[in-house]
Design a protein with these regions (language model features):
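Short, small-residue-biased leader/transition segments that mark boundaries at the very start
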Residues: 1-2, 67
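ATP-dependent small-molecule kinase catalytic core of the GHMP/sugar-kinase superfamily
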Residues: 3-5, 75
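Anion-binding (especially nucleotide phosphate/pyrophosphate-binding) glycine-rich loop
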Residues: 5-58, 86-171
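N-terminal amphipathic, basic-rich helices that act as targeting or association modules
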Residues: 52-73
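Gly/Ser/Thr-rich beta-alpha loop segments that engage phosphate groups in nucleotides
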Residues: 65, 71, 79, 161-163, ...
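Short Gly/aromatic-enriched secondary-structure transition segments
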Residues: 76-83
Length: 174
């Protein structure tokens, strides 16, 4: 759904999105209150970073646990995976600029120029490399790639074994 930032904030703060939140996180009152505030805070952080962007989409990408075949997917193997109730959320605004700006809570902003999708060695091991790689692969496949601004926050901790990078991949393909 596309709403303006003020509409999203009101919808979450007032509880109008509780039916959607309960599908993702369960319907315990304390959990819903925590998630409402989490989304409101993320929208506020986005609008502070990108005040010129008003029309927003919101995405959730779950972490996952690999029940069998852990890490074999990297070599085109099979994995039995299950989503967990921890996720990464992204507040996103699309635009025609040829740049992706992604700011994750507690990390520096990544900026990827979509007019240059070649490998940048300085980005190795950083989120920008994942973003650039996904955009490059889409371009190779003939998919039109355009810019967006995004703010993300995650309850999937880096290094937790719950595929925090995979959650970032899912958010980056929005």
């Amino acid at each position: 759904m596309l709403f303006r930032s003020t509409e999203w904030t009101e919808a979450f703060a007032s509880g109008k999105m509780d039916d959607k939140l309960s599908l993702l996180y369960g319907n315990a009152k304390a959990t819903l209150e925590q998630q409402r505030q989490r989304y409101v805070d993320a929208i506020q952080a986005f609008t502070e970073l990108y005040p010129e962007r008003e029309d927003l989409y919101i995405y959730s990408a779950p972490g996952r646990t690999e029940v069998g075949g852990n890490h074999t997917d990297h070599q085109h193997g099979c994995v039995l995976a299950a989503a967990v109730n921890l996720d990464a959320i992204a507040i996103v605004s699309f635009h025609e600029d040829q740049v992706i700006r992604l700011k994750s809570a507690n990390y520096p902003q990544d900026v990827v120029d979509l007019t240059d999708l070649s490998v940048h060695l300085a980005e190795m091991g950083k989120s920008a490399a994942l973003i650039r790689g996904i955009a490059a692969r889409f371009a190779e496949m003939g998919v039109s790639v355009s810019g967006f601004d995004a703010y993300t926050t995650s309850s999937v901790l880096s290094g937790s074994g719950l595929s925090s990078s995979a959650a970032l991949d899912r958010k980056s393909v929005v």
